[in-house]
Amino acid sequence: MKNTGLCLNSAYFGFYAHAGFVHGLVRGGFEPSIVTGCSSGAMIGALYCAGIDMEEVVRLIQKIRKNDFWEGNALTQAAKIFARGVSRYSGLLTGRKIRALLEPYLGGLKFSDLKIPLGVAVSNVTTGRRELCTEGSVLDSVMCSMAFPFLMEIQKMKGNDYIDGGVVDHEPTKEMILDPSVRTIVVHMIETERETPPRSPIVRAFHASLSIIDHETRDLKDRLALARKTKIVRAMTRTPHLGPDRTHYGETALHAGQKSAATILRSLKIPRSRANGRGLA
């Protein structure tokens, strides 16, 4: 759809709901001119922009289980800390199995190869800056954007260290707001329902910090969008709490994403149209 951007936000194990949401949009005839994504949103956004049929993406996501991305066990993880030392340890997973899972779809692709312009939000630990990747390796950028602190090791790209873009930017819309060719931005947000709050004070403080950053930056971007007369439409999908040992709730999350897409399509009255945007600056 001309002049319309799509943003897939950062969400822990949010690839189920994001896949369902994009699948639902595609079935409804919606095609954005630009896509941005962060963390799990970057993964689904990249697969979609690469031209992978969303039916195939849904099948891929439905099959994901812990063994597809988890590395080792408690003993090998402890040995890893001992071998590297605390000062050089940055996460449980190297990300190699996730990269292998995505390699058949994104391996070797540059951003310039994509069917739809894509921006991937990442956090540059080396420079202390948030970045939106629009050039270079798509897979490298997605891996950096998905490197959730302490779960996945810090990722290397072009000589710099990177972690999950969602640490500082849950919904990367700034560049689209500043792009005069984009008049409407559809943002897919995911909210997970935790059965009980985290008991650890450190974990609670970490999650609270992310939430505060998210709310503050969202408010600023909403003000920027208002000033530039860019319409932001948010679709909220609520899912069960997901994680490495809770992938069995993935199907529920996927269907919830599809329902959110149907709601957005009805509210926006999206016509069947092909994109014709300029890309991200």
Model-derived regions: residue spans:
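Patatin-like phospholipase
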Residues: 1-38, 46-281
